[in-house]
Structures are given as structure tokens and as C-alpha cells.
């Protein structure tokens, strides 16, 4: 099983909470296994959105999970950072207030926290 790097809740905005998780992957099957592993934790299984992007040897994949455009935000940040053979998952628990365009900034903030963690280590 692929080892997950789960940073937990890294920020909140107007009641919504965001967490970020990632793992090394080399195939779509690996991505699916990581998502399944993450969702074995009840909080993540019940999250409003688990958006993700992956850079694989065969190309890029992404999924918005109802948070339109969020997968592309994650993917572009991964591509700019040169992060390959990886999946990054940004989880949101909706807090009752719509965030509008700020939701993309929060996805960026969560993704940046993960990328920074990879650069600096635990």
C-alpha cells in the first residue's frame, strides 16, 4: 500500500476547513488505492469534496469531486513545481458559507502547504 502524507487540516475560511494529503503514485490504480485508503478515515469519507490531481508517467489526471475547477488548480501547481509520480488531494468540509472565488485561493493554499512540506520535510 502506498504511504500517505496527510497534513490534516491546514486552514479554514468562513467555517470551511481544508486538509491536504499526497502520495507517490505511478498508475491510475495507485491513485484509486490512495483515494480508497484516505476514505477509510470517516472524516475524509464524509468530506464535502476530495479534489485531486495526479502526474503519472502516462500523463496527468484530475477530478473536481463537485468543486468545479479545483482539480485543474492542483494540477497546474504540481506541473509548475515539477512534481511527478504523485497525487495531491485537497479535502474540503463545507462550513455553510459560499466562498466564491476564494475557494480557489484556499485550494492553492492547501496545495502550497503540501509542496512546501515536500521541500522542507516533516
Regions found by a protein language model. Name each.
Residues 1-68, 78, 116, 120:
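C-terminal regulatory domains involved in ligand/effector binding and gene-expression control
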Residues 69-71, 84, 92-122:
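Active-site-proximal loop/helix of nucleotide/amide-processing enzymes and allied scaffolds
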Residues 77-84:
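Short glycine/proline-enriched loop/turn "hinge" motifs that connect secondary-structure elements
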Residues 72, 76:
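Short, contiguous clusters of charged residues that form electrostatic/catalytic patches at enzyme active sites
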Amino acid at each position: 500500500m502506498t504511504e500517505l502524507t496527510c497534513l490534516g487540516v491546514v486552514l479554514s475560511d468562513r467555517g470551511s476547513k481544508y486538509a491536504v494529503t499526497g502520495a507517490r503514485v505511478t498508475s491510475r490504480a495507485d491513485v484509486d488505492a490512495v483515494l480508497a485508503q484516505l476514505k477509510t478515515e470517516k472524516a475524509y469519507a464524509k468530506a464535502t469534496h476530495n479534489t485531486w490531481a495526479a502526474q503519472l508517467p502516462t500523463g496527468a489526471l484530475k477530478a473536481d469531486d463537485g468543486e468545479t475547477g479545483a482539480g485543474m488548480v492542483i494540477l497546474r501547481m504540481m506541473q509548475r513545481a515539477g512534481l511527478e509520480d504523485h497525487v495531491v488531494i485537497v479535502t474540503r468540509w463545507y462550513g455553510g458559507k459560499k466562498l466564491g472565488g476564494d475557494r480557489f485561493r484556499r485550494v492553492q493554499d492547501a496545495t502550497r502547504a503540501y509542496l512546501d512540506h515536500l521541500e522542507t520535510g516533516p
